[in-house]
Amino acid sequence: MTEATLTPPAVPRLTSLSHGGGCGCKIAPGVLSELLKRATPPALFPDLLVGTETSDDAAVYRLNDEQAIVATTDFFMPIVDDPFDFGRIAATNALSDVYAMGGKPILALALVGMPINVLPHETIAAILRGGESVCAEAGIPVAGGHSIDSVEPIYGLAAIGVVHPSRVKRNAAARAGDVLVLGKPLGVGVLSAALKKNQLDAAGYAQMVATTTKLNRPGAELAALPGVHALTDVTGFGLLGHTLELARGANLTARVHYASLPWLAGVEAFVADGVFTGASGRNWAAYGTDVRLADGLPPVAQALLTDPQTSGGLLVACAPEAVDDVLACFRADGFDRAAVIGEMVDGPSRVDVA
């Protein structure tokens, strides 16, 4: 842990105050889709380059021919018990959506909901400091925010970034023949479930915090590469869910090579022991009909592939000739587990895993 926990022993664990943690507490994708269908369709705005059409990572609004604004918000309940780490993870996760659009963050606003009569002010202050530390690392200020007294602890950011209109990377622009590259290892949801069950050791906790607090800064550089066609980040809907968004947006089939997927240490063993989040099942129920799992995959495959990631890695669809540059971009920023995991091919809008 990077800062001593400030809560006294009598104070409840942060994770005990929430019914779900991190991106695992997202509304299930099927329910969210149904809710959005019932919403009033937005008016047409010619300068709104990216809205809700393809469930992309952030909204993008063109100011002029040289500049567009990237706007997003993300918040959730605690995924860890250390308040400083919770703040860091939530802030890193929120900024990721700006990077996933190819943008550069310029400022953030804090979104804070806390059970004021349950948590000491020192604990809440540590959460805020954690978020501020990540924003400082990203080179941006926390310029304000909003707070409420809530039943469960909630923290996150509204993040604003900038991007050149020609460099906006949507999740619906993959092409047949593109190679899929993933920036971070998978399994955060499994580790969070193990933590909540008191089964995660210090080494497991350290790797969980390390991956969830690593900023997806390569996004802006990746957007500048001519061979990069589509970009998103893997979060609450799991690898399958976000890969399926690429496939649906491009009307293609995404082929994922299970043996090539990078995993955080220990997650396969945890799942084999029945330790994973309820969100995995909800994710599969929402989109499993559009996924084909090959015979011979390990029994843990479905739970791992649907595992909700908090502050997960960037998922890139790029031309084959751009793969080396994409991997070099990741490696230069310390993403040493970045890996080629599949490709986009002609076919129905689905994900095939073999």
From Swiss-Prot:
Its cofactor is Mg(2+). It is an enzyme of class 2 (transferase). The keyword Oxidoreductase does not apply. ATP binds at K26, T54, S55, D56, D74, D97, G145, H146, S147. GO terms for biological process: selenocysteine biosynthetic process. Mg(2+) binds at D57, D97, D233. The lineage of its organism: Bacteria, Pseudomonadati, Pseudomonadota, Betaproteobacteria, Burkholderiales. Gene3D superfamilies: PurM-like C-terminal domain, PurM-like, N-terminal domain. The active site is at C23. Homodimer. Binds 1 Mg(2+) ion per monomer. Its EC number is 2.7.9.3. Belongs to the selenophosphate synthase 1 family. Class I subfamily. This is Selenide, water dikinase. NCBIfam families: PRK00943.1, selD. Keywords: ATP-binding, Kinase, Magnesium, Metal-binding, Nucleotide-binding, Selenium, Transferase. It catalyses: hydrogenselenide + ATP + H2O = selenophosphate + AMP + phosphate + 2 H(+). One of its GO terms (cellular component) is cytoplasm. GO terms for molecular function: ATP binding; magnesium ion binding; selenide, water dikinase activity. Synthesizes selenophosphate from selenide and ATP. The record marks K26 as: Important for catalytic activity. PANTHER family: INACTIVE SELENIDE, WATER DIKINASE-LIKE PROTEIN-RELATED, SELENIDE, WATER DIKINASE. It comes from the Bacteria. The keyword Kinase applies.
